[in-house]
Curated annotation (Swiss-Prot):
Keywords: ATP-binding, Chaperone, Cytoplasm, Isomerase, Nucleotide-binding. This is Chaperonin GroEL. Pfam families: Cpn60_TCP1. It is found in: Cytoplasm. It comes from Halorhodospira halophila (strain DSM 244 / SL1). Forms a cylinder of 14 subunits composed of two heptameric rings stacked back-to-back. Interacts with the co-chaperonin GroES. Its main location: cytoplasm. InterPro entries: Chaperonin_Cpn60_CS, Cpn60/GroEL, Cpn60/GroEL/TCP-1, GroEL-like_apical_dom_sf, GROEL-like_equatorial_sf, TCP-1-like_intermed_sf. Residues 534-550 have a biased composition (Gly residues). It catalyses: ATP + H2O + a folded polypeptide = ADP + phosphate + an unfolded polypeptide.
Amino acid sequence: MAAKEIRFSDDARQRMMSGVNQLANAVKVTLGPRGRNAVLEKSFGAPTVTKDGVSVAKEIELEDHFENMGAQMLKEVSSQTSDVAGDGTTTATVLAQAILREGMKSLAAGMSPMELKKGIEKATEAASNYLSDELSKPCEDDNSIAQVGTISANSDEAVGRIIADAMGKVGKEGVITVEEGSGLDNELDVVEGMQFDRGYLSPYFVTDQQTMKAELEDAAILLHDKKISNIRDLLPLLEGVAKQNRPLLIIAEEVEGEALATLVVNNLRGIVKVAAVKAPGFGDRRKAMLQDIAILTGGTVISDEVGMTLENATVDDLGTAKKVQISKEETTIVGGAGRHDDIMARVEQIRAQMEESTSDYDKEKLQERVAKLVGGVAVIKVGAATEVEMKEKKARVEDALHATRAAVEEGIVPGGGTALIRALAALEGLSGANEEQTQGIALVRRAMEEPLRQLVLNAGEDASVVVNKVREGTGNHGYNVATGEYGDLVQAGVLDPTKVTRSALQNAASVAALMLTTEAMVADLPKKDDEGGGGDMGGMGGMGGMGGMM
């Protein structure tokens, strides 16, 4: 085990603070509509130009181990805020640095870090409650959603508008994904209904030769969790569907051999219009998705587990959909005939699974299933002229998407750092059990001005003048950094999601309090180069004598 270096109390905290300052100073220049760019070197290819705080923070590793620990702890603030709310990372970094800076002054004056921590926690709780209960307004209309997206995407109105369109089309439960597009403009693709990535098992099922798609109107849908290889099992169902003159979609683990050949022949002769696809997913997820399709279409999964066999199945066990579209790669079911109550019960069941799940991957897949049942899936294709611009723009669109989700969830507050200034009202008259706790409350009060100060500094204005003017106002009155004017920020469309502002404050206070109560730091000793490390090879000169061995 390598030898360690240990630093204690003030020495440890000062080194940590140095690392915090280096990271925070690099990140905070990107804050706001008039924030500056940061340029990140890449090991190959062109450097990345970004105004995204998290991207800058992720790149920073410091040489000094103790400074690096401070920087990494501050990084945790932005990544936690990003995980919970999807945005507000730069604000959280600015707040944490400010709380820590003010706290270090109090520690230098001989105050107890534990009492300061209690004061910080008390102030944070009061301010967070004020944000959620007093300031927050619901965000429901398209206009508010577009404004939140615009602000989060660094004042890019096109991004805000496309996110609002996507949410309008797939609903608040719908899944919206961001991909790299092929053109210069942003595009929105919306898939309504249930889509899964399995295509037709034979090109002979195609009904439209130009698009190479199979389209079935008012289709009956057979769901089976086993392989189908014997056509005799299917005959009763095929006859029943043919009598009703309806097309049939078969979704099974596999359709092969004689069964597939017979279906193709029947389809080509026009006896019964049919198409077959493999069931989506694998293992337990496949069973769950088949059940989702059954509930969506009002059908039943033919499965041994519930004592049903294919030869005993009737037309009543089949699901129904207004339209089914099948391409080589995917199948889309639109207008399933399932009962609304059954679908909503299934959605609640999946949501309960999401609450219990600890895996982000599982949660994402469960959320996709909810979207396919109730909303749909929208894909925003980001357009840009160059690879560098594409990456930067995609990161901004993803940020904006997270922010709008947070706004829909918990509501909105006036943006531009104004919400935190208004939340200072919650700290008026608030005092701790002793003087040191009261000082903890005071340093949070000072730190809550910092995001507005930084926004104004980045815009090249006088921060103190603006902060005082904003404090004199009430409600949504604040400073619009983009235009340089004072006014009602909600009307001007300068909004922040409540969840983002609240999470930024809570995470910043949590990590700053942790750092202030740090009393010892342990790190690996810097590796020393062995002096004269190459000198040992000198002895090899004697090998010249080996010539005598010939």
